[in-house]
């Protein structure tokens, strides 16, 4: 490898929500800080204003989910996916790979998700295997997998890992959530798993910060309208505390306008809170959905402050990921779970009261997932290089 930086090809896409993009960006920043050169292959719809600490970014013809059921996939222009369109994606991916010399290929979520791109990933791996110094193949996966899989899908995932991957980075602390909670075949791939810790944004210096007693957030806001409306009803009646509702940029303009028009004077409505975890640390209660990124912010706030969490997992479109995560976090004592399908003002009021009584959990949580991932990758690449040198 000489004096050249180890090089990574990081393949990812988001199909609907934006959480995957921001987690990928945090990982890429950590890889760059570790001295790894990163080439990004971006397979989803590009997000305005989002950049990466990468040497290059290669955009494929985008794929997106039609809705939150993820049962139908569309092009970036909301058109039906065709065989020709997917073939063009594959050609674009292989063309990008032809100009790169990665020491490792990382696929975010795949093969535990993103099945729609399995053919192009298969082609990429076959092309990589033909190279004299074939790159390591690494999967990057979050803590919880989506349930309700069709028969045979888990076995398919397992076989991909056993046959095609060298390592799986699980971005979780196994003392809090382990992959086996949602992947029953985990024992078949145990030797390839490495738990990195949770991936969270770096702590920000927020010495001057507008403080609120209760913060309500819903990630990007695409599925947060109901939570925001019910939270506002509770907030308006709670005159003893200041509230802040962070709607997310994807809540409809009409819904956001209605919230602002009906908010009492002690309730602040914003589109986005920069450094959400830091804001939570100055609050007494966090009410949020339970996507990966937001739940990690809530855990970090629990560890560093007196903030307590109410999780309102999105569960109304057949998705199980948030509900399972929220249930596990409630079981561990990190919050109170009220599924969105059961949400009422009274249920939310009771959950806030229950959350206030939660004791602080003394267990230290590993939040160094990004830096640890970078360190593991460097070690694996260097070990592969030493092994190759020995053989030659």
What are these regions (language model features)?
Residues 275-324:
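A donor-sugar binding/catalytic signature common to diverse glycosyltransferases
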């Amino acid at each position: 490898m000489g004096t050249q930086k180890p090089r990574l090809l990081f393949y990812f896409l988001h199909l609907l929500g934006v959480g995957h993009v921001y987690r990928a960006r945090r990982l890429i920043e950590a890889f760059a800080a570790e001295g790894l050169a990163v080439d990004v292959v971006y397979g989803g719809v590009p997000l305005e204003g989002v950049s990466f600490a990468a040497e290059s970014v290669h955009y494929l013809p985008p794929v997106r989910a039609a809705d939150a059921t993820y049962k139908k996939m569309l092009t970036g222009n909301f058109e039906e996916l065709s065989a020709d369109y997917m073939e063009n994606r594959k050609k674009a991916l292989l063309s990008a790979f032809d100009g790169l010399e990665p020491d490792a290929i990382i696929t975010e979520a795949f093969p535990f998700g993103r099945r729609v791109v399995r053919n192009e990933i298969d082609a990429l791996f076959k092309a990589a295997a033909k190279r004299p110094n074939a790159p390591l193949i690494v999967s990057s996966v979050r803590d919880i997998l989506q349930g309700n899989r069709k028969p045979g899908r888990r076995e398919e995932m397992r076989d991909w890992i056993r046959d095609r991957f060298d390592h799986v980075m699980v971005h979780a602390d196994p003392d809090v959530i382990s992959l086996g909670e949602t992947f029953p075949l985990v024992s078949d791939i145990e030797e390839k798993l490495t738990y990195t810790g949770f991936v969270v944004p770096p702590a920000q210096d927020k010495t001057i910060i507008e403080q609120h007693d209760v913060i309500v957030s819903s990630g990007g806001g695409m599925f947060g309208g109901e939570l925001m409306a019910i939270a506002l009803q509770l907030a308006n009646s709670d005159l003893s505390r200041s509230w802040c509702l962070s709607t997310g940029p994807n809540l409809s303009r009409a819904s956001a306008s209605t919230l602002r028009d009906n908010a009492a004077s002690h309730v602040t409505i914003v589109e986005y809170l920069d450094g959400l975890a830091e804001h939570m640390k100055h609050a007494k209660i966090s009410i949020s959905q339970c996507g990966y990124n937001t739940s990690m912010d809530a855990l970090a706030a629990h560890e560093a402050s007196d903030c307590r969490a109410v999780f309102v997992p999105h569960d109304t479109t057949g998705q199980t990921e948030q509900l399972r995560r929220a249930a596990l976090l409630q079981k561990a004592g990190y919050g109170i779970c009220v599924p969105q399908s059961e949400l009422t003002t009274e249920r939310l009021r009771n959950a806030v009261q229950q959350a206030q009584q939660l004791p602080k959990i003394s267990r230290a949580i590993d939040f160094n997932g990004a830096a640890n991932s970078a360190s593991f990758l460097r070690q694996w690449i260097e070990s592969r290089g030493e092994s190759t040198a020995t053989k030659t």
